């Protein structure tokens, strides 16, 4: 069944009416979905979408004028000059027209308001672009100069939205298979002002299943043996979740089902061709999948390339244009499209964009709607929306079913795949994605593709131009090309009143907020680029003529920026472009919100089974989409005005808005203070105010004269809240009147939303309390929280739970007569319970999430991913599955826990087990499977204590000296240190670890001192050899004999020892004074000669003992950890000897003595710890352990060591 048959079956009445209209060439309604341009030769615009009944349609718009405007000084003298300029550059144009427009930058008085422009017409976009580039380089100001997407300019000029119903008139019509082709001119297109009929565009939701013979890996399209073995597709009306048809294309036999049509293919190549064939039969307007732009489309395209069928597939799927492979890859396969998710995050998408079908990745849409979502899986988004979940089918089972070709089991796979596709449409409809984006397109004169794949800034810019160019807004000439030097710097910061930190339990606090501060400032002060006056001279001249100006000044990059804006004084004709647009948007939104309220009230009165409920629901969704679109534009308006890459950017305007915000908040602050009110906190656009004590005198006295029960106190609090609400309502009206008198307009207004009581301020933009909106409500389970980290992305349940307990406990109503525990006491009580009663916590309380961004220096995540990579490689070597350690996609969030590692110390008592977060992280599945212990103390110290410190850092003991600049940071650091010590005192395991470290350090210190003594003895012996100036050789021999007496046995001469002595003698020779015969060098040569000739017996004995020394060293090294020994040897050799000549002679002795000492400490450390109760081990005990160990090394050298 193809699209036309489905349309005829589902909409027979409308289809008959549309058929009659086509036969009589009567006007038709058309809903555009996709836009394509023919930019070579004569410009042609193609619009693809559906007719009223659902027929697929192509609208070809011809005879579209191609032009741009250039500003000139005189309409009489410059046309010829402009012609000569273009001719000199061989730029071909059709004709020139002279017109007048208002330049967008700079104020112009009434008589000079309009400037002459020449509109240059061309036959092609190529010539137009050449001319724009040339004239801009020559310094001319151009307008209507879009160089990327000309269709946006067409939409603006014709006032023809590209995402709403259009009426086709005087068209030529040609049926072409499933497609109904129309040819029109711009005059034949009329924007349909009403909401129009129900849209019957078709959405195809799909999902693919892939297979790899390498178990535990994600199938890779670049691997020849990895295949796509199933593609399931479902089609819907754009507004519905009821499927119109379903198809399963599979390479494995699948049991038949009434829910879908099954197509069995013999190969992957045939499966892909069948997918294209089915796609062409349904001719969808929108194609959607979940994460398909990151996996499904790249897999399909890559496999099609490998089979050599991409060109055939594209041309089957595209009902309109057939293309060659190189053109497909260049123009229609979007390999890397950056989609903005939030201000901080973007994601790369890849897809095949066939003309007439708009691809939409549902995952991207959901991530934009929930930019702080910790999980971005299909299952997570479905749960978040309360929709039915996807089918649970593990990949290893799916692959097993595919391998066995079990038709019944493959039916389960098909159902799994079909439901995944179904859930994509469920999410699109639930979130009203298409209607919302369409309303944005209607306002901004952009396409649906623009609304999905581009950020909000360019839409605001396009909307501004659309308003500006028409007569009712003054025919302002706007360029789309950013000009001038683009400086980077900070605009004036917000006016901030530091919070009065701590818990407020006696007086309610009320927040007064400016309603949409920046848009309101733009409307109030007429901030608009064409109202800007740059020079003081011109400003004085205008004021002398009676004009009212608003002066702005601020410092930017250490220089004063100033300017003036001509005020409108509430005269509509004097309003600038920006205020006019904002006022229009505000009025439209106000009307829509009123309508939305009425529709909502109707919905509550009608049951879902009522015949008119669905229509009412549809109307409610459409109105809501419109008001949301207006809200988006109003909120992003200032962002574009302050964007230095925007063609509308004006530095005095951007900074003037923020500095005016400062001024007005200060104005209100002083007004409120002078009225006797108190200020708890103020920032940017809001003040938190307390009423005078006198307001509560009567109710307080009534309580004091009562029995002061808890009920009486609750009544007192209740009445305080009511009094505050009434007082704030009056104050708010007075503030707004004061603002009106100051700025002369009613656009800048404040409103109060709620009364907070009790309330606690913990820092800038950080506070919580109980909010009372319309009536008093002292429910501690519904707290008003701003900026407290328990709602931070990635935060654990542990932190959220502890933070919530502290806040809820602190918000309890307590009479002044009762004990009111200070916040620090509440924090310590909650913390103690959390640390001591560990059994209350579940595994899920410790799960965290983080994002994998390879290009960012997140050390913990980088270390963790490096460890996981090493594990995967190790498992692959052994042929084991490694999917549990798979790396997430860049930008994707993953879940993990921090696990406990075994406590280890080095010989000096320093912790050697890694405390780095990245070394303790484990995937949740791995930690659960192996039952790894959670490092609770790590969570407490690194996540919980920072939050808890925020609650108590206002305490006097944590306050910094006067000379500290960042007082909040200082107090926070001191408070956290205080809580760390508190946790150490109550955490039994932490106390044990500290004691172990003390024992290690004591043991090391004693052993180190003993070894230094032994080394000192031998150092003194050999120093005597040098100090004996009368007979040094004899002194050396005696010292050597002293050493040799501790060894016995005859062995062969150790030639390596002889080499060492020879090398040392040579090195010493090089180090000596080359002039004359230095005594040191001569002495060494004499020693060497005597060793070889005169004292052969003693030397022979020394050589013989060399083997014994080497044997001893080998024994020691083989019985201890060599790496630790080597490291600690370097650490312990911190003392020096007076003569470098003895270094070699001491080297052997020092080395094996130190190694023996380390061996002692290492060997007996556990015994020391096991015997350790509450007191450190005695010196006698340690000495005894050392003597026992030294004796066990080798009996013959016991005395020598001990």
UniProtKB/Swiss-Prot annotation:
The keyword DNA-binding applies. One of its GO terms (molecular function) is nucleotide binding. Gene3D superfamilies: DNA polymerase family B, C-terminal domain, Helix hairpin bin, Palm domain of DNA polymerase, Ribonuclease H-like superfamily/Ribonuclease H. Its EC number is 2.7.7.7. PROSITE patterns: DNA_POLYMERASE_B (PS00116). SUPFAM superfamilies: DNA/RNA polymerases, Ribonuclease H-like. It comes from the Viruses. It is an enzyme of class 2 (transferase). Sequence repeats lie at residues 1071-1074, 1075-1078, 1079-1082. Coiled coil: none annotated. Consistent with its intracellular location, ASFV encodes its own replicative DNA polymerase and three base excision repair enzymes: a class II AP endonuclease, the repair polymerase Pol X, and an ATP-dependent DNA ligase. This is DNA polymerase beta. It comes from African swine fever virus (isolate Tick/South Africa/Pretoriuskop Pr4/1996) (ASFV). The lineage of its organism: Viruses, Varidnaviria, Bamfordvirae, Nucleocytoviricota, Pokkesviricetes.
């Amino acid at each position: 069944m193809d699209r036309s048959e489905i349309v005829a079956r589902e909409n027979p009445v409308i289809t008959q009416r549309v058929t009659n209209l086509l036969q009589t060439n009567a006007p038709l309604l058309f809903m555009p979905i996709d836009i394509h341009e023919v930019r070579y030769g004569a410009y042609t615009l193609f619009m693809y979408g559906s007719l009223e009944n659902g027929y697929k349609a192509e609208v070809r718009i011809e005879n579209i004028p191609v032009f741009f405007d250039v500003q000139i000084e005189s309409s009489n003298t410059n046309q010829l000059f402009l012609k000569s300029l273009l001719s000199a550059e061989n730029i071909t144009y059709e004709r020139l027209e002279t017109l007048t427009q208002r330049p967008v930058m700079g104020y112009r008085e009434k008589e000079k308001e309009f400037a002459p422009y020449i509109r240059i017409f061309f036959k092609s976009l190529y010539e137009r672009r050449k001319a724009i580039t040339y004239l801009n380089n020559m310094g001319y100001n151009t307008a209507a100069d879009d160089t990327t997407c000309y269709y946006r300019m067409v939409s603006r000029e014709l006032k023809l939205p590209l995402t709403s119903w259009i009426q086709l008139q005087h068209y030529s019509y040609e049926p072409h298979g499933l497609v109904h082709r129309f040819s029109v001119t711009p005059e034949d297109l009329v924007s349909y002002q009403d909401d129009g009929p129900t849209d019957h565009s078709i959405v195809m939701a799909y999902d693919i299943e892939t297979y790899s013979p390498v178990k535990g890996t994600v199938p890779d399209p670049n691997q020849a043996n990895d295949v796509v073995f199933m593609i399931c597709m479902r089609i819907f009306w754009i507004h519905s979740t009821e499927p119109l048809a379903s198809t399963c294309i599979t390479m494995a036999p699948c049991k038949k089902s009434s829910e879908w049509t099954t197509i069995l293919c013999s190969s992957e190549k045939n499966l892909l061709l069948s997918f294209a064939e089915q796609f062409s039969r349904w001719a969808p307007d929108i194609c959607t999948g979940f994460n398909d732009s990151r996996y499904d489309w790249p897999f399909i395209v890559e496999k099609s390339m490998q089979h050599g069928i991409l060109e055939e597939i594209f041309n089957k799927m595209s009902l309109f244009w057939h293309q060659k492979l190189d053109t497909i890859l260049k123009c229609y396969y979007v390999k890397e499209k950056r989609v903005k998710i939030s201000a901080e995050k973007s994601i790369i998408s890849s897809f095949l964009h066939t003309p007439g079908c708009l691809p939409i990745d549902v995952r991207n849409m959901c991530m934009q709607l929930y930019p702080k979502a910790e999980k971005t899986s299909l299952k997570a988004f479905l749960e978040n929306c309360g929709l039915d979940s996807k089918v649970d089918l593990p990949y290893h089972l799916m692959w097993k079913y595919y391998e066995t070709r079990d038709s019944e089991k493959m039916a389960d796979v098909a159902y799994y795949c079909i439901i995944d596709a179904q859930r994509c449409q469920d999410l699109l409809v639930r979130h009203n994605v298409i209607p919302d984006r369409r309303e944005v397109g209607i306002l901004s004169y952009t396409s649906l593709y623009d609304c999905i794949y581009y950020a909000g800034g360019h839409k605001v810019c396009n909307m501004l131009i659309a308003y500006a160019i028409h007569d009712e807004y003054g025919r302002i000439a706007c360029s789309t090309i950013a000009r001038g030097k683009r400086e980077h710097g900070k605009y004036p910061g917000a006016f901030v009143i530091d919070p009065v930190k701590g818990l407020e339990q006696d007086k309610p606090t009320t927040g007064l907020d400016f309603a949409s501060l920046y848009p309101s400032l733009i409307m109030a002060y007429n901030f608009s680029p064409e109202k800007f006056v740059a020079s003081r001279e011109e400003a004085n001249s205008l004021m002398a003529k009676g004009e009212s100006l608003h002066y702005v000044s601020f410092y930017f990059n250490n220089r004063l920026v100033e300017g003036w804006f001509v005020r409108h004084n509430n005269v509509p004709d004097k309003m600038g472009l920006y205020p006019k647009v904002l006022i229009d948007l505000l009025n439209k939104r106000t009307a829509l919100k009123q309508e939305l309220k009425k529709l909502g009230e109707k919905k509550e009165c009608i049951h879902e089974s009522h015949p008119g409920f669905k229509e009412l629901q549809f109307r409610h969704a459409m109105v809501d989409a419109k008001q949301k679109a207006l809200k988006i534009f109003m909120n992003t308006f200032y962002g574009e005005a302050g964007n230095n890459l925007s063609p509308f950017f004006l530095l005095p305007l951007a900074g003037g808005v923020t500095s005016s915000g400062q001024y007005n908040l200060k104005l209100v602050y002083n007004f409120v203070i002078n009225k006797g009110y108190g200020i708890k906190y103020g920032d940017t656009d809001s003040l938190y105010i307390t009423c005078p004590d006198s307001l509560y005198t009567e109710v307080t006295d009534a309580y004091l004269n009562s029995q002061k029960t808890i009920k009486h106190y609750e009544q007192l609090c209740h009445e305080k809240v009511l009094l505050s609400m009434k007082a704030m309502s009056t104050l708010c009206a007075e503030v707004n009147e004061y603002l009106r008198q100051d700025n002369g307009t009613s656009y800048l207004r404040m409103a109060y939303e709620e009364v907070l009581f009790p309330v606690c301020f913990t820092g800038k933009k950080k506070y919580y309390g109980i909010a009372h909106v319309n009536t008093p409500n002292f429910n501690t389970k519904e707290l008003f929280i701003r900026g407290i980290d328990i709602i931070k992305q990635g935060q654990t349940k542990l932190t959220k739970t502890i933070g919530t307990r502290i806040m809820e406990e602190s918000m309890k109503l307590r009479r002044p007569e009762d004990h009111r525990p200070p916040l620090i006491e509440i924090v310590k009580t909650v913390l103690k319970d959390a640390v001591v009663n560990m059994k209350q916590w579940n595994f899920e309380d410790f799960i965290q999430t983080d994002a994998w961004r390879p290009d960012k220096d997140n050390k913990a995540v980088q270390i963790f991913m490096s460890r996981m990579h090493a594990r995967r490689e190790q498992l692959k070597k052994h042929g084991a599955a490694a999917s549990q350690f798979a790396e997430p996609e860049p930008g994707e969030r993953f879940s993990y826990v921090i696990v406990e590692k075994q406590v280890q110390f080095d010989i000096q008592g320093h912790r050697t087990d890694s405390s780095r977060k990245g070394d303790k992280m484990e995937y949740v599945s791995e930690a659960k499977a192996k039952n790894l212990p959670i490092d609770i103390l790590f969570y407490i110290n690194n996540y919980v204590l920072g939050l808890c410190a925020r609650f108590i850092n206002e305490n006097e003991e944590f306050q910094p000296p006067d000379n500290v600049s960042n007082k909040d940071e200082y107090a926070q650091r001191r408070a956290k240190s205080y809580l760390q010590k508190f946790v150490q005192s109550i955490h039994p395991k932490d106390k044990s670890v500290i004691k172990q470290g003390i024992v290690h350090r004591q043991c090391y210190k004693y052993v180190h001192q003993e070894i230094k003594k032994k080394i000192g003895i031998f150092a003194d012996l050999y120093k005597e050899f040098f100090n004996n100036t009368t007979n040094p050789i004899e002194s050396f021999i005696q010292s050597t004999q002293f050493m040799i007496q501790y060894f016995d046995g005859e062995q062969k001469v150790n030639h390596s020892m002889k080499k060492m002595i020879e090398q040392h003698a040579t090195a010493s020779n090089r180090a000596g004074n080359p002039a004359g015969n230095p005594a040191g060098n001569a002495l060494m040569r004499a020693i060497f000669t005597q060793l070889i000739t005169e004292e052969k017996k003693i030397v022979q004995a020394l050589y013989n003992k060399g083997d014994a020394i080497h044997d001893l060293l080998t024994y020691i090294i083989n019985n201890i950890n060599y790496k630790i020994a080597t490291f600690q040897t370097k650490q312990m050799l911190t003392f020096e000897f007076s003569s470098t000549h003895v270094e070699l002679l001491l080297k052997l002795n020092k080395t094996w003595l130190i190694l023996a000492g380390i061996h002692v400490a290492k060997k007996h450390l556990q015994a020391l710890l096991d015997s350790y109760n509450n007191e450190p081990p005695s010196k006698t005990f340690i000495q005894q352990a050392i003597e026992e160990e030294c004796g066990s090394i080798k009996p013959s050298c016991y005395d020598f060591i001990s």
